[in-house]
Curated annotation (Swiss-Prot):
Subcellular location, principal: nucleus
Gene Ontology terms: biological process: DNA strand elongation involved in mitotic DNA replication
Protein known as: Probable DNA replication complex GINS protein PSF1
Localization annotation: Nucleus
Gene giving rise to this polypeptide: psf-1
GO cellular component: GINS complex
The species this protein was found in: Caenorhabditis elegans
Assembly and binders: Component of the GINS complex which is a heterotetramer of gins1, gins2, gins3 and gins4.
Function statement: Required for correct functioning of the GINS complex, a complex that plays an essential role in the initiation of DNA replication, and progression of DNA replication forks. GINS complex is a core component of CDC45-MCM-GINS (CMG) helicase, the molecular machine that unwinds template DNA during replication, and around which the replisome is built.
InterPro entries in UniProt: GINS_A, GINS_bundle-like_dom_sf, GINS_Psf1, PSF1_C
Lineage: Eukaryota, Metazoa, Ecdysozoa, Nematoda, Chromadorea
Length: 201
């Protein structure tokens, strides 16, 4: 057995690390693991080429060793499933960021994305914006109401020194850490999701 085949399980175990990486970080998005993804792609291609070479020998009636065809195929499927789970979980979290942060991602989140993920976020944002603009005569902002409102105004506390904030009626409000305010629910919904404000019960 070649050293490459002996190492088959090693890369399969690394592929599982992609899934565990997301499971261990449920509340944050880890940086895209470019190197590990590259190794997984490389190993799938390597195993595929080895199996293809064996199949060619079988078709040509040449001596061959087919004992590793199925193990290699199983390893390829395992690596692929892990990679798909990794990409799908990241995609779901990136979509949730659009609802949490709006169209502008914090630097800490953007820096964790690869170029393709940034492109996906931008395209998802554009699609959502087009959909909202086509609802009703003036469009509807679906990001404003994550739950049915109980009142038009809510009591909120600022969790950081945010600075000046303008409500929809033009009122200027200074949001300083621990300051209390009564604000229109629709105006502060996004800031609540971003962690700038919290509801005071």
């Amino acid at each position: 057995m070649s050293s490459g085949d002996q190492n088959r399980g090693g890369v399969a175990d690394k592929a599982l690390q992609l899934v565990l990486e997301m499971k261990r970080n449920p509340d944050v998005l880890p940086p895209y693991n470019t190197e590990l993804v590259r190794q997984c792609y490389q190993k799938i291609d390597e195993l595929f080429q080895k199996n293809a070479a064996v199949v060619e020998k079988i078709r040509a009636g040449l001596p061959h060793d087919s004992t590793l065809l199925q193990p290699r195929l199983a390893a390829m499927c395992h690596i692929r499933r892990c990679m798909m789970a990794y990409v799908n979980e990241r995609k779901n979290r990136i979509r949730s960021f659009r609802w949490k942060y709006g169209g502008a991602l914090p630097a800490s989140v953007r820096n964790a994305l690869c170029d393709a993920e940034i492109q996906f976020f931008n395209e998802y944002s554009s699609t959502l914006a087009r959909f909202q603009s086509n609802l009703g005569e003036g469009g509807v902002n679906l990001l404003l109401h994550s739950a049915p409102p109980k009142s038009l105004f809510v009591q909120v506390r600022a969790l950081e020194d945010y600075g000046e904030f303008e409500t929809s009626d033009g009122t200027q409000v200074q949001l300083s850490k621990d300051s209390l305010h009564s604000l229109p629910r629709q105006d502060c919904e996004m800031l609540i999701r971003q962690g700038v404000l919290e509801l005071v019960h």
